[in-house]
């Protein structure tokens, strides 16, 4: 089984991934690690700021890795921002049966009311080098972008709008991953 975890920045994708790793013992692939490896090795001229181009560049690689994992009856969590809204179109139905998907977004009110907590927890799993451009407005815009994009393709989007720990426990105890 493959679990795809995507969503806006600062929504807790990596934290959720870590908790799923602990619960299911599934290995995980951080798309950010793959991205930075390709950039730092000189295998692409793209930069970390080239979000749209990175999605186009990384998705064919990720897609084929996901297919290989499924064909080998293995498990993997794939976590990161670079999953296209129309990702399902890349897989035949037989593959889709072995893929679970979650897109995490936060409501505008949640961001406004919990901004300091969001920033405080930004590096809970991985270190962020620079969060200076991460304003309330930026986070609201990013979350709206992901919510509208994935909903536009009929995907369910998990909305954090209340207590984060309650949301996290609901996701972890839900049936959506098995």
Q: What are these model-derived regions, one by one?
A:
Residues 12:
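Conserved glycine(s) of the Walker
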Residues 54-98, 102-106:
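Glycine-rich phosphate-binding loop used to anchor ATP phosphates in small-molecule kinases
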Residues 5:
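Hydrophobic anchor at the beta1->P-loop junction of P-loop NTPases
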Residues 15:
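Conserved Walker
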Residues 9:
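The conserved Walker
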Residues 144-178:
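NTP-dependent small-molecule kinase module
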Residues 99-144:
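A glycine- and Lys/Arg-enriched "phosphate-lid" helix/loop adjacent to the NTP-binding pocket
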Residues 18-61:
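Conserved substrate/cofactor phosphate-moiety recognition/catalytic segment
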């Amino acid at each position: 089984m493959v679990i795809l975890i995507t969503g806006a920045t600062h929504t807790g994708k990596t934290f959720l991934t870590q908790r799923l790793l602990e619960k299911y013992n599934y290995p995980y692939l951080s798309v950010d690690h793959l991205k930075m490896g390709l950039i730092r090795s000189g295998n692409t001229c793209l930069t970390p700021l080239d979000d749209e181009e990175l999605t186009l560049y990384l998705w064919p690689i990720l897609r084929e890795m996901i297919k290989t994992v499924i064909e080998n009856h293995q498990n993997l969590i794939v976590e990161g921002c670079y999953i296209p809204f129309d990702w399902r179109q890349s897989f035949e139905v037989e593959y889709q049966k072995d893929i679970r998907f979650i897109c995490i977004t936060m409501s505008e009110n949640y961001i406004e009311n919990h901004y300091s907590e969001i920033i405080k927890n930004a590096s809970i799993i991985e270190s962020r080098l620079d969060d200076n451009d991460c304003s309330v407005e930026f986070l609201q815009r990013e979350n709206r972008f992901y919510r509208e994009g994935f909903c536009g393709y009929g995907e369910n989007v998990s909305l954090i709008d209340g207590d984060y720990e309650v949301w996290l426990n609901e996701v972890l105890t839900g049936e959506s991953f098995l």
